[in-house]
A protein has these predicted regions:
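Short loop/turn motifs that connect adjacent beta-strands in outer-membrane beta-barrel proteins
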Residues: 7-16, 50-62, 96-102, 138-144, ...
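Short glycine/proline- and aromatic-enriched beta-strand/turn motifs that initiate or cap beta-hairpins
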Residues: 5-50, 162, 167-180
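Membrane-embedded beta-strands of outer-membrane beta-barrel proteins
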Residues: 43, 89-91, 131-133, 148, ...
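Extracellular loop and loop/strand-boundary signature of outer-membrane beta-barrel proteins
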Residues: 29-31, 76-78, 115-121, 156-162
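Transmembrane beta-strands of outer-membrane beta-barrel pores
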Residues: 23-29, 47, 68-74, 109-115, ...
Length: 180
């Protein structure tokens, strides 16, 4: 498909791979600890493991992905915590490509290790779960992604109390899809 940027990538295809560098940030929402901001940045590797399934607008491909998160910054009222994370559980539904757009839904989960308790008075070991809606904008060699992500951080009862942090984030990334 010819575009102003040249030919667009094919996007997510069965047997393909994704690599991406991303960064995101957001603020806490009701349902957990308030007055907290989050910034995180990471690297993703994904495997597109199915061909196209489902009818109509639901048609798409399933991708499994992992994220290394070397930069977590949690801005809390009492301090700023720095941490790292690993998300080994990334389930992504890549909807059928529409022109240069490749929309997706994602569910993911992992761990967060920080230098201060997150939230304050809880624990330095936490678990993360997230749901995201986004799209890839496919270019000739690379793609940009933009998404809205709901992120939940909790110690899962490792410490008391366990108020958790709920945030809505905007995440952007640059990456590439390819087939071996």
């Amino acid at each position: 498909m010819a575009t102003g940027l040249g030919l667009a990538q094919d996007g997510p295809e069965e047997g393909g791979h994704e690599v991406q560098v991303w960064a995101g940030g957001g603020h806490s929402v009701p349902g957990g600890t308030s007055r907290t901001g989050i910034f995180d940045a990471g690297l993703r590797y994904g495997w597109v493991i199915t061909g196209a399934h489902l009818p109509g607008i639901l048609r798409g491909r399933f991708e499994y992905a992992v994220d290394a998160v070397p930069a977590y910054v949690i801005f809390q009222p009492s301090n700023t915590a720095y941490g790292v994370g690993f998300n080994p559980f990334g389930l992504k539904w890549n909807f059928e490509r529409r022109g240069r757009l490749s929309p997706y839904l994602e569910l993911s989960g992992g761990t967060l290790f920080s230098d201060h308790n997150v939230p304050t008075y809880t624990n330095t070991v936490n678990f993360t779960s997230a749901a995201a809606l986004g799209t890839h904008v496919l270019g000739a060699k690379y793609n940009w992604s933009v998404e809205v992500r709901y992120l939940h951080i909790s110690n899962a009862g490792l410490a008391t109390p366990n108020p958790g942090i709920n945030t809505v984030q905007v995440r952007v990334g640059v990456g590439r899809f390819w087939k071996k």
